[in-house]
């Protein structure tokens, strides 16, 4: 009887060793034992823990989270909806402008164009004076400055039309050209109408266009730099401007701090719309 039990234990032990051996061989062949695999598992667990309390607002028409590294959507809801584009219109304006001007070009902001900015707008609080194109774009991206969007539109239109037009005519010209660009560039589901800042309630877009333009702009270092900080400052002849980022995920005092980032130091970069 004792011999029988001992034999069973030996068989069980050998079986366990055999299973362990097969498992090790399998892990080796599939590469699962490698650090990269473990790192990938960690990233997935970390992302799930970071987003398990993520609640999509009930009135949100569409919502997406895109994994830049894996080139895939993690969330994609509201494909059939055309949400009001709002401040995301600035992304399309910047994309268009980058083909028209250089980042170090000087933009003359005047009081006439500042007075066109719709009441109640989010502002970079620009003063009349000189700024670089790069600074104007940063003012559009960080505090979502509608005044900066109007200044950029005015500058580009005036460069092309020359002197002799009103600020309204310059803005109208810019929007006509921008609308044509959107069609040519394949942003077929975006209509910005008559406002470069996104203040028009008629303007709408689609997740596909929004994510595409966001990913395109993230190829620019200055874009990644300015949107990756909770506060951002520029030095101009008018003085220093410091803006608070409208992205609450970057605000240490926000309950959403570090939950999702447009760009992050980790291997996983996530772009959220």
PLM feature spans:
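Active-site-adjacent loops and short helices of periplasmic peptidoglycan-processing enzymes
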Residues: 33-208, 217-218
